[in-house]
Amino acid sequence: MFYLFNSNKMFFLFILFFSTMISISSNSWFGCWIGLEINLLSFIPLISNSNNLLASEASLKYFLTQSIASMNFLFSILMKMILMKNFEMNNLISIMINSALLMKMGSAPFHFWFPNISEGLSWFNNFILMTWQKITPFILLSYYFNINFLYFIIILNVMIGAIGGLNQTSLRKMMSFSSINNLGWMIYAMMISENLWMFYFTMYSFMISIMFFFFYLLNMFFINQLFINNMNFLIKLNLMINFLSLGGLPPFLGFLPKWIIINFLMINKFYILTFIMVMSSLITIYFYIRIIFSCFMFNYLKLKWLKINLNNKLMNFINLFSLISILGMILSTFLFF
């Protein structure tokens, strides 16, 4: 549901954006924590819906998990200031602060709440959860991180994100595991450079915005809906392009940020980490291709329940973004010359 005609939702959406600005522009850890709390309290009214039991359950689960993460974060920064009197690097404290922020963004191994909550949300709320809600924890993580701990987290993210999405029938759960997988890539991008993280994050947000807009228009929440709906060839082609781009298959736009990260990994001789990350991407591409293949192959069946007709303006809009996904990689080659 979009919030253009609901003043209450628009107000909380504004507070949500404003709270992120408070956190990322604060010059103290306590100010960052206040921003995180305002962010939590503004997102709950957006996702709670008295008419939808799953949404109400998701808002309660979100509140509990984020509260635990906030308490851990506050406890860690207070303990650091009391015991150490400064913010020099300390392994135990840095791991505690990193763990709290990773739990905030739904990273593995603190990801157990993430797919369950995404299952109860609308596509628009899922988009906010998987993009905007990750900005503050990521920027705070970039200020103070434990390198060895984050390498372990990256491996967990890419593996759990890939394997967890294999047996899913819900599109929302599948996209949440895909988000966990991409989180591993984003954490490494953040460790290399904040600019590279921002570039990866922008590309990822662009790709999933197309996918979520697509699912919102077609009112799709489960994989079997792709088979029972009578979609024309152009809609299926657009779906295929965007799925493959999200998976990071060349020559689509989604491959570009992964290519840059693989390049950095190979230069720094992280061969095992490169192998694990590339193999995990192959697994995610496998479950995307499985959906696309079924969607195309089941076309001969006449047992279609719903005929989908998108108006020309919406179709042109989707076609434009799919074209950007195809041409983005070709145009990006000019950036290096």
Predicted segment positions?
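Core, highly hydrophobic multi-pass alpha-helical transmembrane subunits of bioenergetic inner membranes
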Residues: 1-337
